[in-house]
A protein has these predicted regions:
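ATP-dependent carboxylate-amine ligase
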Residues: 29, 86, 98-108, 112-270
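Acidic, Mg2+-coordinating active-site environments of NTP-dependent enzymes
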Residues: 1-137, 216-219
């Protein structure tokens, strides 16, 4: 375990809200910096009360705190979080801040670094990259598991949209229940689901992944439209060509570089 190998003078940065991660603190020879969105989480509250370091969110700011020391960074100055609207990106940023703080990086440098974090594809391709297309919001992400779907849905629900659509395939090397669960989650948040299958099935037979995705959509409380398509780019075109002003489309890309280039070309073409 990585945490067990932290030296006595080192620091482990741990997510206080994940029980499997938080318990690693007892194995750390060095000190621990916890992070969480809520400073009142029991582990965070205890850790802070004992004078240890932690990073949390308060009134639209990231707060790095230890004892009487507090340093505030406005989330409005961290583009990748969309002003704090994207929770999973806020958590990523908190972990980054905690790590830089542990390395004694000065705060001006940390803030400058955070200001350079953005959602564009040049910064981190396939990681919640956002585009504007015909007045609609298009988001491209490489999420391929239930946890990713839950995080993406939470982020999407924080964004305004008159209608939501999603383009998805499934990684054939995942368990059946994991593939099904992805569309179960998406079916609660999207009006339309475009399912696609492409050449790389990772050991699955043709049609097998689509069938599992279809099963996951059964009884979906929100999804009223769905379709099945062979070919990633054809699926992307179908979803993007239907978009109207004020709508939102989440595209769960498979061939990251190629798909990102395809989306960018469509956006440029208008």
């Amino acid at each position: 375990m990585i945490v067990q190998n932290v030296s006595a003078s080192g620091v482990a940065v741990l997510n206080a809200t994940d029980p499997n991660v938080a318990t690693m603190a007892s194995k750390c020879k060095g000190s621990v910096t916890f992070f969480a969105l809520d400073r009142h989480h029991p582990i965070m509250a205890t850790h802070l009360a004992q004078g240890h370091a932690a990073v949390y969110v308060e009134d639209g700011h990231l707060v790095a705190a230890q004892g009487k020391f507090k340093y505030y960074i406005s989330l409005s100055q961290v583009p990748i979080t969309l002003g704090g609207a994207i929770s999973f990106q806020v958590e990523n940023v908190m972990a980054s801040v905690a790590a830089a703080w542990a390395l004694k990086v000065d705060w001006a440098t940390i803030e400058a670094g955070l200001a350079s974090f953005s959602n564009d594809s040049d910064n981190a391709a396939g990681r919640f990259n956002m585009f504007k297309h015909r007045g609609a919001t298009v988001i491209a992400d490489y999420g391929h598991n239930p946890d990713a779907m839950s995080a993406l849905v939470q982020a999407v629900e924080a964004l305004p949209a008159t209608r939501r659509s999603v383009v998805i395939s499934g990684a054939g090397d995942r368990r059946d229940q994991d593939i099904r669960q992805q569309t179960e989650i998406l079916g609660r948040a999207f009006d339309e689901v475009v399912m696609f299958e492409d050449q790389c099935q990772r050991g699955r037979k043709d049609g097998e992944v689509i069938a599992l995705l279809r099963e996951g959509l059964k009884g979906a409380p929100r999804t009223k439209e769905s379709c099945e398509i062979y070919g990633e780019f054809i699926a992307i075109d179908k979803a993007m060509d239907k978009l109207k002003d004020g709508e939102l489309c989440l595209i769960l890309v498979d061939q990251v570089e190629e798909a990102m280039a395809h989306i960018a070309a469509k956006v440029a073409a208008g």
